[in-house]
Amino acid sequence: MSLLALHNITKSFGPLKALSELTFEIGHNEVVGLLGDNGAGKSTTVNLISGIHRPSSGHISVDGKRQDFTCRRDSAEAGIETIYQNTALVDSLSISRNIFLGREITNSLGMLQLKQMREISMQVLESAVHISGIDSPDKLVGDLSGGQKQAVAIARAVFFKRRVLLLDEPTSALSVRETEALLGQVLKLKEEGVSSVLVTHNLYHAYQVCDRFVIMSHGTKVLDVSKADTTIEELTQHVVLT
């Protein structure tokens, strides 16, 4: 049984059909590359899985159970975390406050337990992600590099027991070293039971870590192939020619 599956998803915005009968799945402990040129439908697909949009027809299932995501919270409660290019972090808050943003620990009087959140944040950063240069959860997120911000967002997702990460163009603003660290983290999370969907234009980055590739064009799936059955040259041809 697949962990996450899209079943004949169609999404229209007025007269525009953004997705047409899209079907694919993500397995347990699997990294899937969602590939395609601009306008292929990748962002719409991510927004549907994230609960931002609802399908016009078709449905999403998690562990074989049909889901009806009406908001991002529904998707998160099903174990899915979307990490966008901007990571949805607040630059003016500390790492600790960002990890618990919207999920703050309070006492019986409703007061924030800042010390407890700080201690847990430090444990999260040490155990879930190795982040060079971060030695304190008190650092402002605005002072972090792009790679460090991505790592904090991933650490937050892991701490809250997400089972599927949707990584939307995660390497677009990263240095070569940060990119290698992030791709390494995706593989590490796979070993720990977290599946990932890597949405990217960069086939070389996807090819390093993905087990399978789904290529989209004009809102439809044109290829669904395992890494063992293709090459990066063949993937490039499919993206360029479709």
Regions found by a protein language model. Name each.
Residues 2-242:
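Glycine-rich phosphate-binding loops of nucleotide-dependent enzymes
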